[in-house]
UniProtKB/Swiss-Prot annotation:
Annotated binding of Mg(2+) 1, by residue: 84, 103, 105
Family membership noted in the UniProt record: Belongs to the FBPase class 1 family.
PANTHER family: FRUCTOSE-1,6-BISPHOSPHATASE-RELATED (PTHR11556), SEDOHEPTULOSE-1,7-BISPHOSPHATASE, CHLOROPLASTIC (PTHR11556:SF35)
NCBIfam families, per the entry: PRK09293.1-3
Annotated residues for binding of substrate: 106-109, 198, 264
Annotated pathway: Carbohydrate biosynthesis; gluconeogenesis
Protein name in UniProt: Fructose-1,6-bisphosphatase class 1
Location of this chain's protein in the cell: Cytoplasm
Tagged with keyword Membrane: no
Cofactor binding summary note: Binds 2 magnesium ions per subunit.
Gene name per UniProt: fbp
Domain of life, source organism: Bacteria
HAMAP family recorded: FBPase_class1
Amino acid sequence: MQNLQGMLRDQRVAQDLQEVIFSIELACKDIAKKVQLGALAGVLGATESENVQGETQKKLDVISNDILKASLAANSNVLALASEEEDNVVAANAGGRYVVAFDPLDGSSNIDINGQIGTIFTIFEALDGVAANSGKHFLQQGNKQVCAGYVLYGASTLMVITVDGPTSCLTLDPATQTFSLTNTALQVPDQTQEFAVNLANERFWLPKFKSYVADLKLGEEGVRGKRFNMRWNASMVGDVHRVLMRGGIFMYPSDTRNPKQPAKLRLLYEANPMALLIERAGGKAFNETQRILDVTPCALHERIAVILGSEQEVATCLEYLN
């Protein structure tokens, strides 16, 4: 069975980019070990600090962030880093060709209940003539990503990745600590009968989106004429992985709860990498008005509405909204 190195070699990925991906792989293997040990490793519970998002940091958030930073900073091909847990860009190595952004541990509310969590990452080529610690490197459209992926720490540890080809899935063998290719090209079904959305926010939704979800819930007797099941993991990695494996639509729309912050998910290291993975698997990924990968970021931690998944269902949702 082919390993990650063999897969990248067959795809003729540039050697320096391969090395950056291997640094992410190494870090995620370390994180996976700590996740598996849980309370035995003393990594559960919260810290007394908040990140730039105003969110209370879990111990494993901080540990995962430190592991990824150390692994990537040790790679001479990495010019700079950006993380959900860091206020600003972190300069790494002068002369590095790539910049890497990541959410070190998505779904951290699931940590203490042994639920699904994961690491999301994206890689861009650094801009010429721009200082290493400049945010400009990261304000590129998502269609400029040279690699995107996530590692899901679940019943098995999986890496889902796309470089310059399909969205592929690799499974970690805990005995050999090797990621082996188990699905060469994931394909999202065009149609679905599953949706993922946080219904607790329904009272804050805009009327058109509320109408769309209401019709999903009506089942066979409603205008959609079929039964839909709702699934919600409170982890973007877990919910998007399900969509990639068997279809569905994942939605985190804008809402009115906080007028200064109408969206929840971050464009750079959540929406963009997931959008690329979904599109390379035949699905669609939009905010409420345009393709996510065509959005030009304005800020490092910019937030955006996300609607992604099976092509026909995303199109139907957008018809309601527009």
